[in-house]
Design a protein with these regions (language model features):
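Structural/interface elements that position substrates and couple domains in central-metabolism enzymes
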Residues: 1-432
């Protein structure tokens, strides 16, 4: 099948590459000439495990191509995916200008019946707006379908190739058959294609992310209370996670969520609620608690230094919002670095993938180590912000000698408190 993907960001690139892997001919379109040139030369602008192998294979076999020309990219395409950014406005609403502009352009360019698919995360009712923008100019039949992505950064290729489910919003039987044909290779193990209306599909995406953000936030609140009452949040997690009604995932306490999805989508759903005069109180609480949780380690850090961090050297392990990605959007590390700098501290950081992205924000205001141990050298204390595997079993004897004080502030609960005490460390974690 001939497929066009408009937008070569995270979602667009994974979508295009994975569809090419199942034998489709895919052309990805982007207005960024420099980005397209790099992609044509085999350079991927994001870090995502497993993507590079598929990308190189499908470029070599000429199933995956890139262009800046929309007309060229969509020619003879049976399906056109819109994987465009929907950045939040100041009021939390999703900015649809890119999607609606492309929709208008498509109206002028469509030559045959085509299925237009919203892959971006968009507010309820967007499929209708896209349909109307295309219809103003189109001379052929078309359908607009909502097909939200449920990719997790770090395991996006696996999520795409072996989905838990595929949600498709359409009221057209013709479009339904096209989408069934497209996704058939991905659901051979029995995971469902779930058909619903376009509005329900758009709402499903927001509901899923808001629920997961709420689950994370609830456990962080439990962790904070555990510290007050002398309980251990790890015990609580095991105690409730074995209840099949609750499940084991997204129960790890820490210093909050970040990334390109949860913060933006919770905010957008809250804005949708306000627009419809519904007071979605849980979402407001989730956003407030998560904002506070990101800098949860600052208070015990200040207490250790008697309130004065001026001139103190802080080592920081982890910058990306989660492991296995270089994405720093809404990452807790950013807020912690900013607060530490404002308090007069010096910061030296290490992350396996995200340091170049952080350098674009902080430049020379902080130091960048070439290894985890390099960050520790002559630092007063260590803060752990992201749970990269490389941080899970360090040589604590070496770490203790490099640090001025054997003190760790762990925002991801990587180590057992009793083990750290035995090793002679002062160890602060979350909810334990």
């Amino acid at each position: 099948m001939k497929i066009a993907v408009v937008g070569t960001g995270y979602v667009g690139l994974v979508t295009g590459t994975c569809f090419a892997e199942t034998g489709n001919t895919v052309i990805c379109v982007d207005i960024n000439e420099e980005k397209v040139k790099k992609l044509q030369n085999g350079i991927i602008p994001i870090y995502e495990p497993g993507l590079e192998v598929l990308f190189e294979r499908n470029i070599k076999q000429e199933r995956l191509k890139f262009t800046t020309n929309l007309q060229e990219g969509i020619k003879d395409a049976k399906i056109i995916f819109l994987a465009l950014p929907t950045p939040p406005g100041e009021d939390g609403s999703a900015d649809l200008q890119y999607i609606l502009k492309v929709a208008s352009d498509l109206g002028h360019l469509l030559e045959n019946y085509t299925v237009i698919v919203d892959k971006s995360t968009v507010p309820v009712g967007t499929a209708e707006l896209v349909h109307n923008n295309i219809k103003k100019h189109a001379k052929v039949d078309f359908d607009v379908v909502s097909n939200p992505e449920f990719l997790r950064e770090g395991v996006a290729v696996e999520d795409f190739m072996k989905p838990d489910r595929v949600v498709i919003g359409t009221s057209s039987e013709k479009a339904k058959k096209v989408m069934e044909q497209l996704y058939n290779p991905f659901i051979r193990q029995g995971n469902p294609l779930i058909f619903m209306t376009e509005r329900s599909a758009e709402m499903t995406k927001y509901a899923a992310n808001a629920f997961l953000a709420t689950k994370i936030t609830f456990m962080n609140e439990i962790a904070n209370l555990c510290e007050k009452v002398g309980a251990n949040v790890d015990d609580i997690r095991r105690g409730i996670g074995t209840d099949t009604r609750i499940g084991k995932r997204f129960l790890f306490a820490g210093i909050g969520y970040g990334g390109s999805c949860f913060p933006k989508d919770v905010q957008a759903l809250a804005k949708t609620s306000k627009d419809h005069k519904y007071d979605f109180q849980i979402l407001d609480a989730v956003m407030q608690v998560n904002h506070q949780q990101k800098t949860r380690l600052i208070e015990p850090l200040k207490a250790f230094f008697n309130g004065d961090l001026k001139g103190k050297q802080i080592a920081m392990w982890g910058l990306a919002f989660k492991p296995y990605t270089d994405d720093i959007r809404e990452a807790p590390a950013l807020e912690n670095i900013q607060v530490l700098l404002e308090m007069g501290a010096k910061v030296r950081v290490y992350d396996p993938e995200a340091m170049e992205n952080v350098k674009q924000i902080f430049g020379e205001k902080i130091e960048y180590a070439d290894s985890p141990y390099g960050a520790l050298l002559n630092s007063d204390v260590l803060m752990i912000i992201t749970e990269w595997p490389v941080f899970r079993t360090p040589d604590f004897e070496v770490a203790g000698k490099l640090l001025k004080n054997k003190v760790i502030f762990d925002g991801r609960n990587l180590y057992e408190p009793s083990d750290m005490t035995e090793l002679g460390f002062v160890y602060h974690s979350i909810g334990r």
